[in-house]
Amino acid sequence: NSAHPCCDPVTCQPKKGEHCISGPCCRNCKFLNSGTVCKRAVGDDMDDYCSGITTDCPRNPYKGKD
């Protein structure tokens, strides 16, 4: 069983100097840049973009209500 390369095995938190462990806006232990598409549009929808400060893929604020 190998440890995740971004995770401190003792604390289960990102290693020093790393931003994240996993998520749609995390790659190679770093947050993806602001404006990186994290969810492509389907139909009349609009793309969702990473914020650059979190691993979440926030919903595009200009989308209509579900």
UniProtKB/Swiss-Prot annotation:
Residue ranges the record marks as coiled coil: none
- UniProt GO molecular function: toxin activity
Q: Could you tell me the keywords of this UniProt record? A: Cell adhesion impairing toxin, Disulfide bond, Hemostasis impairing toxin, Platelet aggregation inhibiting toxin, Secreted, Toxin
Where in this protein would one find the motif Cell attachment site, according to its record?
Answer: 42-44
Query: Which species expresses this protein natively?
Result: Echis ocellatus (Ocellated saw-scaled viper)
* Subcellular localization(s) per the UniProt record: Secreted
Q: Which SUPFAM superfamilies match?
A: Blood coagulation inhibitor (disintegrin)
Tissue specificity of this protein: Expressed by the venom gland.
Question: What other comment is given for this protein?
Answer: When it dimerizes either with EO4A or EO5A, there is no inhibition on alpha-1/beta-1 (ITGA1/ITGB1), alpha-2/beta-1 (ITGA2/ITGB1) and alpha-6/beta-1 (ITGA6/ITGB1).
Provide the taxonomic classification: Eukaryota, Metazoa, Chordata, Craniata, Vertebrata
Sorted alphabetically, which InterPro entries does this protein's record hold? Disintegrin_CS (IPR018358), Disintegrin_dom (IPR001762), Disintegrin_dom_sf (IPR036436)
Disulfide bridge positions per record = C6-C29, C20-C26, C25-C50, C38-C57
Record-stated family: Belongs to the disintegrin family. Dimeric disintegrin subfamily.
Keyword field contains Phosphoprotein? no
What binding partners and quaternary form does the record give?
Heterodimer with EO4A or EO5A; disulfide-linked.
**Lineage: superkingdom:** Eukaryota
- Entry GO terms, CC: extracellular region
Question: What is this protein's record name?
Answer: Disintegrin EO5B
Q: What does this protein do?
A: Poor inhibitor of platelet aggregation. When it dimerizes with EO4A, it inhibits the adhesion of cells expressing the RGD-dependent integrin alpha-5/beta-1 (ITGA5/ITGB1) to immobilized fibronectin. When it dimerizes with EO5A, it inhibits the adhesion of the alpha-4/beta-1 (ITGA4/ITGB1) integrin to VCAM-1. When it dimerizes either with EO4A or EO5A, the inhibition on alpha-IIb/beta-3 (ITGA2B/ITGB3) is low.
Disintegrin domain: residues covered: 1-65
